[in-house]
Amino acid sequence: MSRFFANGSDSESESSEEEVQAPNFNKATAFQFSDDEEEVKRVVRSTKEKRYENLTAIIKSIRNHKKIRDISNTLTSFEDLTKAYQKALPVISKEENGITPRFYIRCLAELEDFINEVWEDRDGRKNLSKNNAKSLGTLRQKVRKYIKDFEDDLSRFRENPQEESENEDEEAAAHDSDGGLDAGSDIEKREPTVAATKLAKSVPSKLPVADDEDSDESIDWDPDTESETESSEDENQYQNMRERFLKRSTEKDDKDDDKRKDKRKEQKIKLRKRAEDEDGEGWETVVKGHVVEKPKMFEKDAEIDIPLVLAKLLEIMSARGKKRTDRRLQIDLLFELRDISDQHELGVPISVKIHFNIISAIFDYNQKISEPMKLEHWALLLEVMQSMMKLLLANPDIQLSESVAEEHEEYNATPYLIRGCPLAAVERLDDEFTKLLKECDPHSNDYVSRLKDEINVVKTIELVLQYFEVNGSNNERCRIYLRKVEHLYYKFDPEVFKKKRGDIPNTTQTSVDIMDRLCKFIYAKDDTDRIRTRAILTHIYHHAMHDNWFQARDLILMSHLQDNIDAADPSTRILYNRMMANLGLCAFRQENVKDAHHCLVDLMVTGKAKELLAQGLLPQRQHERSAEQEKIEKQRQMPFHMHINLELLECVYLVSAMLLEIPYIAAHEFDARRRMISKTFYQQLRSSERQSLVGPPESMREHVVAAAKAMRCGNWQACANFIVNKKMNTKVWDLFYESDRVRDMLVKFIKEESLRTYLFTYSNVYTSISIPSLAEMYELPVQKVHSIISKMIINEELMASLDDPSETVVMHRSEPSRLQALAMQFVDKVTNLVDVNEKVFDMKQGNFFQRGNMGNRGDRGYNRNQNNQGGNWGGQRRDNRNQRNRNQRGHHKNQQNQNQQQQQQHQREQQQVQTIDEE
């Protein structure tokens, strides 16, 4: 054996030779290969090393992107990570028995926490760039979808995330043969060559490289079990001979290492449990950070009485609002003080005082008024509020009022006087309940859970209402009555209709009766316009919801709200818009189509019904709002359970417009001065007519437009089928109470208006038409057809007369035929075209011929005798133009006279219709 290999050996038989050759050891380690061998420096790595190194590199880049909040690049790196993990799956299933590496689970958990943190930071989200904001939503969806396959691994990781650091210590003790992954650190790959070089420099050659537990184990270097290819790969893997002959772990060693790790872990757990069992009573878990010692309430031998408790209460509440006050500790101290007071039986007044201070402390816990309070504090607030009001109602001699000064409080003799305002507390509680509802997703179970709390909120309001009916002033009673009304006005009560039908006794109290009692008290006693205005609006809304059309209409007309609503605050204007929308629905249900259209036209013509009803913000107008305005508008939004169905509202508006607009269009088809009743419906109809190919209707608007086209032809059956069908019933009509009655009313109106449209359209075709045939065609009673035609004749809409013996309608040829009307329109347009052409010609000629000297060209040889001729020709054209202007002015006066006559005739028609209705 050569001396070089002898230096690299570690056997005992050659130990003396190693000692002799010790001075030459450095030369052997510094031995270099030839130039050809130095050029090729390949490191042969296994597939596991390659895949894991790729994963760790991507994970490191993700962490760097998270530090600088680069969401866009984080999304890109996450996509690369999923692809790399997909490639590494075969290695994981083979090497790790299908168990996902812990460092990968850790990366997913950290990424999920990072996304949730950024998503909950709303102010920070607004400051993100457009690209990062868009990438955040995409990344959140992809991560939530991706981690569903790792839920069990993530849950185990979150239960014991510190296990990874223990693995790190164990792996540091036992060298990893693959160059290993440090699971506790940033999961960076260790290079075997670097580790071996450091070990060669730091450890003497005569000492073994392995740890103490492995020192007695020998490595089997059997040349017969290794192929030539493996030896060649080993030779190419290392740069010098010392690295080649350093000890490396085999598969057997890896298994032994795993066993030793498990044994160490079990021993640590046993020792920890044993220590906890032995010394658990004398030890406490130390919380990280500064620990605030809970102050003692009273001295051990102190005599607990009312002055001492009040002094302690004042001491606790004096820290209210200060910067370093622990608000949670303050609430806990107040509860402890209440318990001490109850234990020593200091009386109900002191308990009420502590209750009210607990309520104030809970309200103070949330510093930002715009954000909702925590659910634990909300449940606590409801409990304490109801407990305080029950104490007040059970003890009438206790007066809790804000008019009592603190120095005049009385706890020893009746009447007990305590400073506080339960009305302000219940108003704040009601506002917090609304904020909680707005914060929840309306389509989630959380919203339903929070909505169940409304029962407790209403009970609390009832308790406060009972207290102030005995002890409160008129102003305070009006305020608490309004809170009660605002929780009642939008709720539908079927008992009202049962009472109308006589199914229940008349003595039964319904929500309408409660609203009448509360609102009438506010009308009589309130001295502020806002409370009275809101009470009127809620009263009208409730009447309209229960089909009390005439009461609601009379109330709004007598109050003159529409005249001064523009001066009201935004929340009151929102309530006014909601009232008008519900009033329009009520008018539609009560067959008052024209009134329904008038109520809804102001809301729907703007195209911003969603914003006007405070049911959401339109994304199209986002650029028009600043961040502060958007925040304010979101605070004004109505809770989801109070929303009005916008599709129902739009459908009622379009159907009402169709029933009014289509007969009017048929009656004034050739009228150039025809006005539009509904601009929105007219635009929908015109846009549909401009389309070359129109498919079957799908949306609600398309159904209404298709029904309008059928009505223009007088086809009532097709019109009714488009309005009343399975799809429209599901979307719209089934949302009404007594929907069958509404559908029957719709079909009846469609028949009547289709009959009117048919007579307007085809009156110039008939000389006479039979009334029974019209009744059979439109499936209406003969008396109804006779009544409709009579009204049309009286209103001078139809030029005809009724022949009662023969039951026919005789048409009068007073109106021009279709061909004549088109010819008249053509003549008017040609006349206008001629006038326009003459004006254009005059503008092009200018004033050349009006100058007497023909442009003053006498010096160029023109005859001066021609000046008069040119001047006369220009004067003639001027006379013609003046005459034409006079004719136009005369024509304009004639048109004005005709318009005045038509207006007078229209007024006479309205008077006649009113007299007929009165009869």
Curated annotation (Swiss-Prot):
Biased region (Acidic residues) positions are 11-20, 162-171, 210-236
Is Cytoplasm set as a keyword in this record? yes
Q: Where is the composition biased (Low complexity)?
A: 895-919
The residue ranges flagged as biased composition, category Basic and acidic residues, are: 241-269
- Tell me the first and last residues of the signal peptide: none
Residue ranges for the region (Disordered) are 1-28, 154-275, 848-919
Q: Where is the composition biased (Basic residues)?
A: 883-894
Where does the record place the PCI domain? 640-816
Which GO BP annotation is one of this protein's?
Answer: formation of cytoplasmic translation initiation complex
Q: Any one cellular component term from GO for this entry?
A: eukaryotic translation initiation factor 3 complex
UniProt GO MF annotations: RNA binding; translation initiation factor activity; translation initiation factor binding
Q: What is its main location?
A: cytoplasm
Record keywords: Cytoplasm, Initiation factor, Phosphoprotein, Protein biosynthesis
Q: Extract the InterPro entries matched here.
A: EIF3C, EIF3C_N_dom, PCI_dom, WH_DNA-bd_sf
Give compartment(s): Cytoplasm
Q: Which SUPFAM superfamilies match?
A: Winged helix' DNA-binding domain
- Which superkingdom is the protein from? Eukaryota
Explain the purpose of this protein: Component of the eukaryotic translation initiation factor 3 (eIF-3) complex, which is involved in protein synthesis of a specialized repertoire of mRNAs and, together with other initiation factors, stimulates binding of mRNA and methionyl-tRNAi to the 40S ribosome. The eIF-3 complex specifically targets and initiates translation of a subset of mRNAs involved in cell proliferation.
Q: How does it assemble?
A: Component of the eukaryotic translation initiation factor 3 (eIF-3) complex. The eIF-3 complex interacts with pix.
- Per its record, how is this protein called by name? Eukaryotic translation initiation factor 3 subunit C
The record lists the organism as: Drosophila willistoni
Q: Which gene encodes it?
A: eIF3c
